[in-house]
Regions:
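N-terminal secretory targeting signals
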Residues: 1-70, 322-345
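Short clusters of small/polar residues that mark proteolytic maturation junctions
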Residues: 86-88, 291, 353
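Solvent-exposed alpha-helix faces
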Residues: 108-109, 216, 349-350
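Single conserved hydrophobic/aromatic residue that forms the stacking wall/gate
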Residues: 343-354
Length: 354
């Protein structure tokens, strides 16, 4: 009897061992099978891979992308708040008189367009391009805004800034606060007219991407957008001063040379090169484009050729199907293809003391 029980226990132990062995082998085989299948959700992807995949889905559009002279450029869908195209669009660059877009909208929001502005010696002494404001004389805010936006007069920009901000430093603070408010964290302005400048914090700069967002705000999202568009769409403006009649002409050629441009601002300094920012509209689709470092003297028309290329691309079928991810904001050109690199937005700048 004892011998029988021992044999019985041995058989049970053997059966248990075999069962455990079979289960273990089955689990191992199952795991390897899952590994081979690479089931969704089991793979690890870096954020860089995710950015590459976003671009990869549009590589077939690369041959249709505009060929530009600009060092930095961007094309922005103002409704979706996404970038359709970008080249070095988060690089900090001098941006010349495109600064006046923000100068104009801050002035419209903070002051009355019918204010009377007394001209300081500082404003009167600004370099060309200038209206020739006379220190001590008074002008209407509206006339100064038209002079700044149509003819890009530097003295008008300073007079507006001092009136609205109390000083150019005070106005720069208002500009940088507005830039931060609308998400333009790559922008830092020192002068209201965009002339090159530096201080202890940084140099006067923006990015192609930020300038698109600034234009989008000015043209469509500010409570003063209607007034802004009225000013920037005016082809010729005339008013009377003590010095006689003044006539301003709009230098935004795209208003008459394309069917879609509704606003724009040019710019140039030796450091910035030729610059241009515009708002375009077709069939209710609202977009902005920006160009920085778009040639230097003897290549003044590069910006118009580039702008037209971007406008044509913006209203084409290719652009309607394109998408540049928020992470895809800095680009490198390699042959006929475009590689987008990951960009991380900086933290909001402390501008309380600037």
């Amino acid at each position: 009897m004892i011998i029988f029980l021992k044999k019985y226990k041995s058989k049970i132990a053997l059966i248990v061992f075999i069962c455990v062995l079979v289960c273990t082998v089955s689990c191992l085989l199952g795991f390897k099978s899952l590994e081979k299948q690479k089931m969704p959700g089991l793979e690890k992807k870096s954020v860089f891979m995710a950015a590459e995949n976003t671009v990869a889905k549009n590589t077939d559009k690369a041959v249709n992308e505009p060929k530009l002279h600009a060092v930095s450029a961007a094309l922005y869908d103002a409704d979706d708040e996404t970038f359709i195209y970008g080249r070095n669009m988060r690089d900090s660059m001098a941006n010349a008189s495109t600064t006046k877009l923000l100068t104009c909208i801050v002035a419209l929001e903070k002051a009355d367009i019918n204010d009377t502005v007394t001209i300081s010696q500082n404003a009167a002494s600004q370099p060309a391009v200038k209206l020739g404001l006379v220190a001590g004389n008074s002008y209407n805010m509206k006339d100064l805004l038209y002079g700044m936006m149509l003819e890009s007069f530097n003295d008008c920009a300073y007079a507006i800034a001092e009136h609205v901000g109390g000083s150019t430093e005070g106005f720069a603070k208002l500009m940088n606060e507005k830039a931060n408010e609308i998400g333009c964290l790559g922008t830092y302005f020192i002068t209201p007219n965009g002339l090159d400048a530096e201080n202890d914090i940084s140099f006067h700069h923006s990015t192609a991407g930020d300038l698109c967002v600034i234009m989008s705000y000015c043209a469509w999202k500010s409570p003063k957008s209607t007034q802004f568009l009225e000013i920037t769409q005016t082809m010729q403006y005339t008013f009377e001063t003590k010095e006689g009649q003044m006539v301003f002409n709009n230098h935004n050629r795209l208003l008459t040379e394309t069917d879609y441009c509704i606003s724009g601002k040019t710019g140039f300094t030796t450091k910035a090169g030729y610059c241009y920012v515009a708002a375009v509209e077709k069939d209710g689709r609202r977009m902005c484009l920006s160009l920085l470092g778009c040639g230097w003297p003897n290549n003044k028309n590069y910006k118009w050729a580039d702008a037209k290329s971007l406008v044509e691309y913006a209203v084409s079928d290719a652009a309607e199907d394109s998408y540049c991810d928020a992470a895809c904001v800095t680009t490198q050109q390699t042959g006929d293809t475009q590689t987008c690199l990951l960009y991380t937005s900086p933290s909001p700048r402390d501008i309380s003391g600037s």
